[in-house]
Amino acid sequence: MAKKTPSIDTKNLTAVQLMELDSCTRCGECVKWCPTYAASGQKPGLAPRDKILRWRQFMNKSYGIKAKLFGPTEIPQSELEEFKDDVHGCTTCGICATVCESGINTVELWEALRTNLVKKGIGPFGKQNMFPKLIGQYHNPYMKDQKDRLNWVPPDVKIEDKADVVYFTGCTAGYNQLALAFATARVLNKLGVKFSMLGEEEWCCGSALIRTGQVHVDDVPRELARHNVEALKKKGAKKVLYACAGCFRASKVDWPRLLGEELPFEVVHVAEFLADLIKQDKIKWEKSINKTVTYHDPCHLGRHVGVFDAPRYVLSHIPGVKFVEMDRVKEFQRCCGAGGGVKAGIPDLALGVAESRVKDAVATDADILSSCCPFCKRNLMDGRDSLKVDMVVEDVIELVAEALGLETK
């Protein structure tokens, strides 16, 4: 009789992650905080605890004592498909890791489980499976021509051919959310910062692939990282600036892992860069904003990398800004709902999470809801529009540009 093979495998899980699966005490603290669980109407399968317990059951059926004695118990395909849907119904925001009493690194775990399933031919979710082909072929997820990478650059913006500082625009800002790119470039010019850009040599950072469990597909993410690092080196980069939290996280955390070496340049978010200039008294403001502003921490910038204070420092020093905090901030903020491929794969769920976050902002009576990420901005705008709320959603760098008397159009 042919030997039965397990329905799942452990090849993509580290020894630590296997121990973490066993360390969950089922306390349920993560369930109270999970944004997608709440936005789904408390669908049990989306709860972090439930996902860990179900995978633990799968492991027991495949590799437990009974499985060793009598062979693995087959896990119905329908169960695996349902689990795939639930593990992809997560923004990988990381709040469950923050509140976990057992210290489980859930963000890494969810991504490992997604990769495990994709390798078995289960997943990713919906149109997320187009990411490797699109990004591999076009070097961006929007099927845009690479020759158009710098089409957004207005005549008044000066870009050096080579410079110590390189602005990595990102696909979203460079193709879709041009106000973010305008603001960043003009602010750098205004402050006398000489900077270069990669132009058509800038490829996608790979975040969308990594977050959705497709880090291994055709080796695309590693090739993206390798190409971008080499292109940045050719530009003479000593410091690379990012206005996109997703690109920033991918470059700072994922690229070194993919390449197996430290990056030969410093990775800095533009909020950190501006905060340092303010501390050195190198910014001369020209206009008072005179608005009440609250701030949403992007998960990729905040919980994933630990940049919480710089954006707040910048906002609090913009003339006329009355800065107010929402109820859930910093390590305990509520996700905007766009991350982890949820905006692309399950837009209704992403919108539900965004609506919850917009309600947090409305409770502060702020005029402006700001953030440091184009994905957060897009989804928060969608949440605002869905709720028909009269509130401006702007990136911090856009507010800085306005206070410097600059256009963002």
UniProtKB/Swiss-Prot annotation:
<feature type="binding site">
    <location>
        <position position="93"/>
    </location>
    <ligand>
        <name>[4Fe-4S] cluster 2</name>
    </ligand>
</feature>
<comment type="pathway">
    <text>Cofactor metabolism; coenzyme M-coenzyme B heterodisulfide reduction; coenzyme B and coenzyme M from coenzyme M-coenzyme B heterodisulfide: step 1/1.</text>
</comment>
<protein>
    <recommendedName>
        <fullName>Dihydromethanophenazine:CoB--CoM heterodisulfide reductase subunit D</fullName>
        <ecNumber>1.8.98.1</ecNumber>
    </recommendedName>
</protein>
<keyword id="KW-0472">Membrane</keyword>
<dbReference type="GO" id="GO:0015948">
    <property type="term" value="P:methanogenesis"/>
</dbReference>
<feature type="binding site">
    <location>
        <position position="96"/>
    </location>
    <ligand>
        <name>[4Fe-4S] cluster 2</name>
    </ligand>
</feature>
<dbReference type="GO" id="GO:0005886">
    <property type="term" value="C:plasma membrane"/>
</dbReference>
<feature type="domain" description="4Fe-4S ferredoxin-type 2">
    <location>
        <begin position="81"/>
        <end position="110"/>
    </location>
</feature>
<feature type="binding site">
    <location>
        <position position="24"/>
    </location>
    <ligand>
        <name>[4Fe-4S] cluster 1</name>
    </ligand>
</feature>
<dbReference type="GO" id="GO:0051912">
    <property type="term" value="F:CoB--CoM heterodisulfide reductase activity"/>
</dbReference>
<keyword id="KW-0677">Repeat</keyword>
<dbReference type="InterPro" id="IPR017900">
    <property type="entry name" value="4Fe4S_Fe_S_CS"/>
</dbReference>
<keyword id="KW-0411">Iron-sulfur</keyword>
<keyword id="KW-0484">Methanogenesis</keyword>
<dbReference type="InterPro" id="IPR051278">
    <property type="entry name" value="HdrB/HdrD_reductase"/>
</dbReference>
<feature type="binding site">
    <location>
        <position position="27"/>
    </location>
    <ligand>
        <name>[4Fe-4S] cluster 1</name>
    </ligand>
</feature>
<dbReference type="GO" id="GO:0046872">
    <property type="term" value="F:metal ion binding"/>
</dbReference>
<keyword id="KW-0479">Metal-binding</keyword>
<feature type="binding site">
    <location>
        <position position="100"/>
    </location>
    <ligand>
        <name>[4Fe-4S] cluster 1</name>
    </ligand>
</feature>
<feature type="binding site">
    <location>
        <position position="90"/>
    </location>
    <ligand>
        <name>[4Fe-4S] cluster 2</name>
    </ligand>
</feature>
<keyword id="KW-0004">4Fe-4S</keyword>
<dbReference type="InterPro" id="IPR017896">
    <property type="entry name" value="4Fe4S_Fe-S-bd"/>
</dbReference>
<comment type="similarity">
    <text>Belongs to the HdrD family.</text>
</comment>
<dbReference type="Pfam" id="PF02754">
    <property type="entry name" value="CCG"/>
</dbReference>
<feature type="binding site">
    <location>
        <position position="34"/>
    </location>
    <ligand>
        <name>[4Fe-4S] cluster 2</name>
    </ligand>
</feature>
<keyword id="KW-1003">Cell membrane</keyword>
<dbReference type="InterPro" id="IPR004017">
    <property type="entry name" value="Cys_rich_dom"/>
</dbReference>
<feature type="binding site">
    <location>
        <position position="30"/>
    </location>
    <ligand>
        <name>[4Fe-4S] cluster 1</name>
    </ligand>
</feature>
<feature type="domain" description="4Fe-4S ferredoxin-type 1">
    <location>
        <begin position="14"/>
        <end position="44"/>
    </location>
</feature>
<comment type="function">
    <text>Part of a complex that catalyzes the reversible reduction of CoM-S-S-CoB to the thiol-coenzymes H-S-CoM (coenzyme M) and H-S-CoB (coenzyme B).</text>
</comment>
<dbReference type="InterPro" id="IPR009051">
    <property type="entry name" value="Helical_ferredxn"/>
</dbReference>
<keyword id="KW-0560">Oxidoreductase</keyword>
<comment type="subunit">
    <text>The dihydromethanophenazine:CoB--CoM heterodisulfide reductase is composed of two subunits; HdrD and HdrE.</text>
</comment>
<dbReference type="Pfam" id="PF13183">
    <property type="entry name" value="Fer4_8"/>
</dbReference>
<dbReference type="GO" id="GO:0051539">
    <property type="term" value="F:4 iron, 4 sulfur cluster binding"/>
</dbReference>
<keyword id="KW-0408">Iron</keyword>
